[in-house]
Curated annotation (Swiss-Prot):
Residue ranges constituting the Helicase ATP-binding domain according to the UniProt record: 854-1026
Domain of life from the UniProt record: Eukaryota
Compositionally biased region (Basic and acidic residues): 1-16, 406-429, 474-490, 497-506
GO cellular component: chromatin; Ino80 complex
Name of this chain's protein: Chromatin-remodeling ATPase INO80
Keyword NAD: no
Organism ancestry: Eukaryota, Fungi, Dikarya, Ascomycota, Taphrinomycotina
Length: 1604
């Protein structure tokens, strides 16, 4: 089997088959540098299909490559091939020069087709083998491919005519030219044609082989029609027509006829054979031709000398000859084109067939030879390497098994030695014990026989010495015997170890001998064999070291170890020396026998190694079977394992050596290390001791703190119990004191009888509420009340020292049974009539209020006038000032502080009601206020009727800014309008006003309690600081019970509530509208619930997902100012979503990106009265049409000398025209009754008039458009040709209105689409047409551009005609004229109305019609309304209110929402006004006046904080709260701007609430605050509501967010 046909997995490779064109695409070419085909490496076998021809798609412009398998190359101007892969172009000469000799004979057949192959004489069999070739059309080798010859383009260029070479190679022409023999042409035409080339057309839809401007298209060297017909190239037919035409396409040509046809001359101007030679010479000089140039048939061809005539003109009277000549011209040109195409296609097919055959033979043979050479070398090296690796692996496995057996035997021998040593030790101990016993017995015998005679002793001793051995001798012999036994066992063990080591050596030798190849030849030196040798050397060295260690050799033992032998061992050796000498013979014999056995085993091992391996073939057979399984996977893996093991062994050995060295040097550092260890241990012990004592102290401290905490808790509970009892008694004291105060004030007791001295009265702080008795506390309360009355009277006397007071002894009792503040406590004290200087009539309840205020002033007591909004608090306050001026001659100074929006109202009402009081409006800039202060800020100023001022009106902001100036004046009366502005006792405003010097203070507020009871205490302390001194205690007393009642509907103590009312009654007067004003109807409040729109839901859910519960709880616990601000910000974001999503982000105006250019601006002032501004917008993209395509009748075909438009004009519109006058006359004369033109006599028209009408281009155009709408299709084709295939698809996606132009509305019949129908049904059709023109597009394009400009380079005629067609004044009137102009022409000009009018648009409009669809996308206001649920409801509500003549006040919390509402009102065309915090004071006055006096104003937009205080807007009868305020009192004041005195209509209040959002919780919270007011002011019961925190702090808002 051929190894080159085997793959690595053992499967057979498929035989080579020449690939087709599709498989060859994208392959690499031959790489001659490495002498390896197709750019592959030596071990890479992925080259079974080596292909080097690459198909290039850039040879054809704007179209895919042709489907042929091989394509022709491109050639540049210098004749070299132009290709993207020139870097990898095959050098066949170099390739052939490097082919080995053994393949020269096989390769010589291919070298005939390689250029310069004869230049290699050094290669045998390769030189002089090029077969003879036949010349073809180009006199080149017929069987070769031009791409294989580097010099072929130059040679071909030299042999082609200059005019033809321009079309073929686009190179610089050369003057020399050779003719082509007919034999070469016939032989070339007889070559076979590839099947794929014959079946596939060479020319596709988008590529013209004869287009001069398609430079990338391949051209043939035959004559092209573009060359024959190009007048600018000055092609001379007599030079190249008959000489260079291929015989296949060269019929017999009449020189005169060809001259006539090619130059386009009429027959009347043909030259005769007898023409003069001078005329011919003149023509040759004119056209720069050689004088001796002749054709093959020796016929002289001369060009025409007369001017060229248009083919449409009639140049001769002989119409028949003219027609024949033109037909011959047309037919011959068609015949010439067909012949040329056939020759070109045949030549192309022949070249492609030659290229395919050459490629197949070269590639197939080269691959086969290379495969054989590569496969033999690869298999030789690869197989030997695999076998060697397997041998090494088997040897390694066997060595590992041998080493494992050795280790096992070694362990067994060590165990035997240990057992023998133990037995020997036991025997020695026993011998010593027996020897000691015998010695004792001998000693006893000596002592017993001491008294015997010496003779007997001597005899006995001599006998004993002769017959029995001595006991010492016996002892020595036993020791020697045991020692010899142990030595024998050691010798046996060492002999076994020697045998094992010899076996290892024999195994290594056998493994080494196994590395020899089976055929006896040594393997070549490869990296694999070198690695195996080094590995073997290391393994043998390791085995020798192991055997030496096992045998116990002492040669490798260091000398130092010998010196360290202990003295005990030396003594033992000396003791057993005698035993060793006696048993040396036995041990020597044993050693000799052991050596003999070892030598015998070595001999056997050597014999085994040297003997021939009988199982060698069997092993090799097994190896061949295993090789295919483990060659790819096992060998690399095992090799990696071996490498890793070797690395691990070396690493372990290195670490072991390092550890040994460290241990050897340890004794040198023993002292230092011990010291360090001692210090470390001491530190650790000290640290642990400290930790223990700290832990102990911490536990003791915790226990102590726990005990202290428990004690504090017990004490705190006891203190709370005592404090609760103390507070209860203190509250009772305060109530009693206030009741007595009210009683004293009402009865007007005498000072001498009832009021004690101040020295006998104790202060509240000095009273001990824990130990004092009830009687003592009551007595102290009486004294405190009397003292308070005395202080109040003394304070008023400071201002009345110089005035005479008229005492009034009338008194009244308290009305303790009433639970309201409608009847003042000081009633019946004295009656006050309405002042005469007051220029209005007070109502009954207003007169009662004046009496109450006058009595408070007389007693020096401050009060709170808390009438409901709209009951005339301002008039009552002004009447008090008039009363003081008229009755007591107190003309001031009076100070009125009011919100900024009501300052003008105060000034106007004071001037109108009391003209005698001079009022100074104190507001404006810093400079203005400085000037105003000169009038009232004076020292020692007296106030009477002639004083420069009496009343100063200013705002809260200015009072705080200029507090130093106001504090320098002693004010008789200070009136605070909308006193809820000082509800916070911690504000700087409250503190500044409290420091003013004034006799009396009057607070005007419609809501004395807005949120909590703490605000009520702030007002009470402001008017009576001596009674209501403790803020915390007041809040603790009243907030706990009343607010909990409003929160959870608990039961109130009625008695305590009555006493609380008694506290407030002396200082507060409050009336409601329903009780005192019967003519003012009640207001109707409605809640309008709105749903979130889809856009609002998305934003609301997004905000909810961003909230972190953990952060909210943490912020609720902290409760700082920053925390409250951040939580408030979150709540406001939710409220923005409920109002309108555009509060986050407005929708911008969008328009597509304009990809166009414009001309520079025109100076209009220089153009005079008439300015012509043409359409000058241009696209960045321009499309070039080849001149030949334009002139040959392409997309924009126009009549010309060399186009077919002249034939169409002549034959189709003139000769073959049924409207010809001659044909019409003949038809009428031949058949007057049955002629199709018999109707002419009825319309009184002549055939000539009919022919002129037909020749009108407009009539032709309308006829075609009416019949088949071909014009519209042509326009679409042009658009698709310029923009691409997706243009029509994009237009289908758009919802575009139909253009309303003249074409659509004008017609000739009285149908629904005729102009007369539309003119008579204008009212019916106007609405529908308006909807169509205003229709928006569904799809918004990202970019827009004008149509792509088309131009033809080199043709001025195209540019002129194109601009004339688009800019012509007559045609532009019909193409782009608007509808209005056409209607005017129809109505005013009857002549124009008779003309035929086009029914459909001729061209798309360049601009945008008036009122039609625009690309500029302005946000839709309808969508703006639909995006908000509230705005949608408001839109419907305003329509109803407008229809019923209502006027509306709309309140907002956010000024940005007011901005959006202004856009909505402008869109709906509602007249409105706007007032917010940014409005100036003067503007507010003017807007209020304008609203009250202009009934056409429909809506008043106000902010709740700025426009809800103090102004009178009774002209409105409807109030709408777009979003509710946190404070219900603010909303109540805002709705009372319309529901007040002077309102004649029913007031309706609408409150918009978004369902299921945070707004619902805000409204519930506001209702609970209203319940607090209801309890405190009117004493009514409340309905049960959801339990919530009334403090209004961060925890309340956190609870709302958690519910979200």
């Amino acid at each position: 089997m051929d190894p080159s046909r085997e793959t690595f997995d053992g499967s057979t490779r498929d035989s080579y088959k020449p690939p087709n064109g599709a498989e060859m695409m994208g392959q690499s070419e031959l790489n001659t540098q490495n002498r390896i085909p197709y750019n592959t490496s030596a071990n890479n076998r992925n080259w079974q299909i080596p292909l080097y021809w690459q198909q290039r798609g850039n040879e054809f412009q704007a179209s895919p490559p042709p489907p042929l398998g091989y394509v022709t190359p491109e050639y540049g101007a210098t004749g070299t091939p132009v290709n993207a892969n020139n870097a990898s172009r095959v050098d066949y000469a170099t390739t052939a020069a490097n082919v080995p000799e053994e393949y020269a004979n096989d390769y010589s057949s291919e070298l005939a087709y390689i250029h310069n192959v004869n230049d290699m004489p050094h290669v045998d069999g390769l030189s002089n083998h090029s077969p003879a070739t036949q010349p073809d059309l180009f006199e080149t080798p017929a069987q070769s491919d031009p791409i294989l010859f580097s010099s072929y383009p130059h040679a071909a260029q030299a042999r082609v005519d200059p005019s033809i070479s321009k079309d073929l190679y686009n190179m610089v022409p050369r003057p020399d030219a050779n003719t082509v023999s007919p034999h070469a042409a016939r032989s070339a035409s007889s070559l076979p044609v590839p099947k794929e080339a014959s079946e596939t057309p060479f020319r596709d839809a988008s590529t013209d082989l004869f287009d001069e401007h398609a430079h990338a298209a391949p051209m043939h060297s035959s004559i092209s029609i573009s060359t024959l017909l190009s007048d600018s190239d000055r092609y001379e037919p007599h030079v190249s027509l008959t000489e260079n035409i291929s015989p296949v396409m060269a019929p017999s040509i009449d020189a005169r006829l060809s001259q006539t046809i090619l130059r386009g001359l009429p027959p009347a101007q043909k030259l005769s054979p007898n023409s003069s030679q001078s005329q011919i010479t003149h023509n040759r000089r004119k056209h720069k031709l050689p004088l001796n140039a002749t054709t093959n048939n020796s016929v002289v061809l001369t060009p025409d000398t007369s001017p060229l005539l248009d083919s449409d003109e009639v140049v001769s009277d002989d119409d028949s000859n003219e027609q024949q000549t033109m037909m011959m011209k047309f037919n011959y040109l068609q015949h010439l084109r067909n012949k040329r195409d056939e020759a070109v296609h045949a030549e192309k097919r022949r070249l492609l067939d030659i290229r395919g055959s050459i490629h197949d033979r070269l590639v197939c043979r080269y691959e086969n030879r290379y495969n054989k050479l590569h496969a033999s070398e690869y298999n030789h090296h690869h197989d030997w390497a695999v076998r060697q690796a397997i041998r090494e692996e088997v040897a390694a496995v066997e060595a590992a098994k041998i080493r494992a057996d050795e280790e096992k035997k070694k362990k067994e021998r060590e165990e035997q030695v240990r057992l023998l040593q133990e037995s020997a030790d036991k025997d020695a101990e026993m011998n010593e014990a027996s020897t000691a016993t015998s010695e004792n017995e001998d000693l006893k015998d000596d002592l017993s026989l001491a008294d015997l005679s010496s003779k007997k002793t001597a005899n006995s001793q001599a006998t004993e010495n002769n017959n029995t051995p001595s006991k010492a001798k016996v002892k020595a012999e036993s020791k020697v015997r045991s020692k010899a036994k142990s030595d024998k066992s050691r010798a046996k063990l060492s002999s076994d170890t020697n045998k094992d080591s010899e076996k290892n050596d024999n195994n290594d030798a056998s493994l080494q001998s196994a590395g020899v190849a089976s055929d006896g030849e040594s393997s070549p030196e490869t990296p694999l064999t070198k690695a195996s040798k080094s590995k073997k050397a290391k393994a043998s060295k390791l085995a020798n070291d192991t055997s030496k260690n096992a045998n116990g050799e002492t040669k490798s033992t260091p000398k130092k170890s010998k010196k360290k032998t202990s003295k005990a061992q030396q003594e033992a050796n000396s003791t057993t020396a005698e035993g060793k000498e006696k048993l040396s013979g036995d041990s020597t014999e044993t050693g000799n026998s052991t050596n003999k056995e070892a030598s015998t085993e070595d001999t056997k091992a050597n014999a085994t190694a040297s003997a021939p391996n009988k199982k060698k073939k069997t092993v090799e057979t097994l190896q061949q079977q295993v090789i295919k399984e483990i060659a790819r996977k096992e060998i690399p893996r095992v090799y990696k394992i071996i490498q890793q093991n070797q690395y691990n062994r070396s690493t372990n050995a290195r670490k072991t050596s390092q550890l040994c060295g460290r241990e050897a040097r340890r004794w040198q550092f023993r002292t230092i290390k011990n010291n360090k260890d001692m210090q470390t241990k001491a530190k650790r012990a000290m640290r642990e001791t400290m930790v223990f004592w700290k832990r102990n102290e911490r536990v003791e401290r915790d226990l102590r703190k726990k005990a202290e905490r428990e004690a504090l808790d017990r004490a705190k509970k006891e203190e709370e119990l005592r404090e609760s009892r103390r507070q209860a008694r203190k509250l009772d004291f305060l109530i009693t004191q206030t009741e007595l105060y009210s009683h004293f004030v009402g009865r007007k007791m005498d000072r001498e009888q009832d009021l004690p001295s101040a020295t006998n009265t104790a202060s509240v702080s000095e009273i001990n509420f824990d130990s004092d008795e009830e009687e003592d506390i009551r007595r102290l309360a009486v004294e405190s009340a009397q003292e308070a009355v005395q202080k109040a009277r003394e304070h008023s006397q400071l201002f009345d020292a110089n005035r005479q007071q008229s005492p009034n002894n009338s008194s009244s009792d308290m009305n303790e049974g009433e639970m309201n503040f409608q009847n003042p406590t000081l009633v019946n004290a004295f009656e006050v009539k309405q002042p005469k200087m007051l220029m209005c009539k007070l109502k009954e309840y207003q007169l009662k209020g004046l009496n109450w205020l006058a009595n408070l002033y007389e007693q020096g007591i401050n009060g709170i006038l808390a009438d409901e909004m709209g009951l005339g608090k301002t008039v009552q306050s002004i009447s008090v000032m008039a009363y003081l001026a008229e009755t007591h001659n107190i003309w001031g100074p009076f100070l009125v502080i009011a919100p900024a929006s009501t300052l003008h109202n105060w000034q106007q009402e004071i001037t109108r009601f009391v003209p005698k009081l001079k009022c100074i409006p104190y507001w404006g800039s810093t400079k203005d206020r400085k000037i105003l202060r000169k009038f009232w800020c004076r020292k020692n100023m007296t106030y009477d009727e002639n004083s420069p001022f009496h009343v100063v009106v200013t705002s809260y902001q200015l009072v705080v800014l200029d507090a130093q100036y106001f504090q320098s004046v002693k004010w008789q009366y200070m009136i605070l309008d909308e006193a809820q502005a000082i509800k916070s006792s911690s504000s700087s405003r409250w503190k500044s006003l409290l420091a003013f010097k004034c006799r009396n203070r009057l607070l005007l507020t419609g809501t004395p309690i807005q949120n909590t009871m703490q605000e009520l205490w702030a007002l009470l302390h402001f008017i009576m600081p001596s009674l209501f001194d403790s803020h915390n205690e007041f809040s603790e007393w009243f907030s706990k019970d009343i607010e909990s009642h409003a929160q959870s509907n608990t039961q109130l103590n009625e008695q305590q509530l009555k006493r609380l009312h008694m506290i407030l009654k002396p200082f507060m007067l409050r009336r409601v509208k329903k009780n005192v004003q019967s003519e003012l109807g009640e207001k109707i409040e409605k809640e309008v619930y709105c749903d979130l729109t889809q856009r609002q839901k998305i934003l609301y859910q997004a905000l909810r997902r961003q909230i972190s519960i953990a952060e909210l709880l943490e912020k609720a616990i902290l409760g700082g100012d920053d925390t409250v601000a951040s939580i408030m910000n979150l709540v406001m974001q939710f409220r923005k979503v409920c109002n309108h999503p555009d509060l986050f982000e407005r929708e911008d105006v969008r328009s597509p990106l304009s990809l166009a250019t414009w001309s520079k601006s025109i100076y209009i002032n220089r153009e005079g009265n008439f300015l012509d501004v043409p359409y000058n917008t241009r696209n960045f993209i321009t499309f070039s049409i080849p001149r030949l395509l334009y002139e040959q009748g392409g997309i924009l075909s126009v009549p010309g000398l060399n186009t077919s438009r002249g034939f169409e004009t002549k034959y189709l519109y003139n000769l073959m025209n049924i409207w010809n006058p001659e044909y019409t006359n003949d038809s009428i004369k031949s058949n007057p009754e049955g002629s199709p033109f018999s109707w002419l006599r009825f319309v009184d028209e002549s055939p000539q008039t009919l022919f002129q009408t037909f020749q009108n281009p407009v009539v032709h155009y309308l006829d075609e458009a009416e019949a088949s709408s071909s014009l519209k299709e042509e326009q679409l084709c042009r658009q698709e040709f310029c923009y691409g295939k997706d243009y029509s698809n994009v237009r289908k996606m758009l919802l575009l209105p139909k253009s309303i132009t003249k074409v659509d509305v004008l017609g000739s019949d009285f149908k629904e689409d005729s102009p007369f129908y539309h003119l008579t049904h204008v009212l019916e059709e106007s609405d529908s047409q308006l909807d169509l023109t205003l229709l928006d597009s569904v799809l918004v394009q990202r970019a827009s551009a004008p149509p792509i400009d088309i131009y033809c380079p080199g043709s001025r005629q195209f540019t002129v005609l194109q601009s004339r067609f688009q800019r012509d004044h007559l045609w532009s009137h019909y193409l782009y004229q608007p509808l209005k102009g056409e209607e005017d022409l129809i109505i005013n000009n009857q002549a124009v109305s008779k003309l035929p009018i086009p029914r459909k648009p001729l061209l798309p409009s360049f601009g945008i019609a008036k009122g039609s669809y625009s690309n500029v996308r302005i946000p839709s206001m309808l969508r703006f309304i639909a995006d908000s649920g509230k705005l949608s409801k408001l839109d419907k509500l305003l329509v109803e209110l407008k229809a019923n003549d209502h006027r509306v006040l709309i309140y907002f919390q956010m000024t940005r929402m007011i901005d959006l509402m202004e856009e909505y009102l402008t869109f709906r065309q509602y007249k409105y006004l706007r007032l917010d915090g940014s409005s100036k004071i003067s503007q507010r006055r003017d807007m209020v006046t304008e609203w009250q006096t202009r009934p056409e104003l429909f809506v008043f937009l106000l902010s709740t904080r700025a426009g809800g205080l103090g102004i009178n807007l009774t002209a409105a009868d409807t109030v709408i709260f777009y979003d509710s305020d946190w404070n219900p009192s603010i909303d109540s004041q805002a709705m009372d701007r319309a529901h007040r005195i002077g309102q004649q209509k029913q007031v309706t209040v609408y409150r918009f609430i978004t369902r299921g959002t945070i707004e619902e919780r805000i409204v519930i919270r506001a209702k609970e605050k209203e319940e607090v007011q209801k309890v405190v002011i009117s004493g009514g019961e409340t309905r049960p509501t959801k339990q919530m925190d009334l403090k209004g702090n961060s925890r309340e808002m956190v609870s709302w967010l958690l519910e979200e």
